[in-house]
Amino acid sequence: MNSFKNFLKEWGLFLLILSLLALSRIFFWSNVRVEGHSMDPTLADGEILFVVKHLPIDRFDIVVAHEEDGNKDIVKRVIGMPGDTIRYENDKLYINDKETDEPYLADYIKRFKDDKLQSTYSGKGFEGNKGTFFRSIAQKAQAFTVDVNYNTNFSFTVPEGEYLLLGDDRLVSSDSRHVGTFKAKDITGEAKFRLWPITRIGTF
C-alpha cells in the first residue's frame, strides 16, 4: 500500500496531465498530415497541421473533412456556406451574385497567367509522371478555377446543412467539384496551426 502511495506521489501529477492530454486529443483537437498538392501554395505536401474540433464553420476556413467515397480525410477550404449560390466566371468568385476576392489564390493565378504554371509544375516535388500530368492539366485549362469539364463559367447551389469545399490549387485539387458538397457532420475540425516542418511553423 505504501509503495502505491509513493508511486502516486511521484507520478500522480504526470499521469493526470497525460490522461488530460489524451482526453483532450480525443474530444478537442487532432493533427493531420497534408497529402498531395491540392492546397498549394498555402499548405505543402507532407506538412502537419494542428486541428481544433467543434468550432463553428466559417467561410474560407481551412478544414479537415471525411470523404466517404474514398474513406479518407482531406484538407480543403470552405467556399460555399449552406444555401449559397457560388458562381465562377473567368477566375472571379461570386457569392450570391456578389463578387468576392480570394487573396490566397493570387500567387498561383499570376503564375497561371505567366506560363500556365509550367515552371511551377516542373520544380521540386513535381518530378516524373506527376509533373507531366499536372502540366498537361494546366495546359488544357483556360482559367485557374474550372469545373470538371474545364468550363471557366459555372455555378453551384449549396444545399442547406452542407458546405462547398475547394482546394487552393484549383487545377489539381479533387474537391466538391468532383465529389459534391459535405455535410457538417463530415467536417471534423478546423486547421489552425502548422506544426511541421520547423521552418514553416505558425499560422497560415
UniProtKB/Swiss-Prot annotation:
CDD domains: Peptidase_S24_S26 (cd06462). Gene3D superfamilies: Umud Fragment, subunit A. It is found in: Cell membrane. Residues 31-204 are extracellular. Its EC number is 3.4.21.89. The chain crosses the membrane at residues 11-30. Keywords: Cell membrane, Hydrolase, Membrane, Protease, Transmembrane, Transmembrane helix. The active site is at residues 38, 76. It holds the Pfam family Peptidase_S26. The keyword Repressor does not apply. One of its GO terms (molecular function) is serine-type endopeptidase activity. It catalyses: Cleavage of hydrophobic, N-terminal signal or leader sequences from secreted and periplasmic proteins. It is an enzyme of class 3 (hydrolase). Coiled coil: none annotated. Residues 1-10 are cytoplasmic. NCBIfam families: sigpep_I_bact. Belongs to the peptidase S26 family. This is Signal peptidase I. It comes from Streptococcus pneumoniae serotype 4 (strain ATCC BAA-334 / TIGR4).
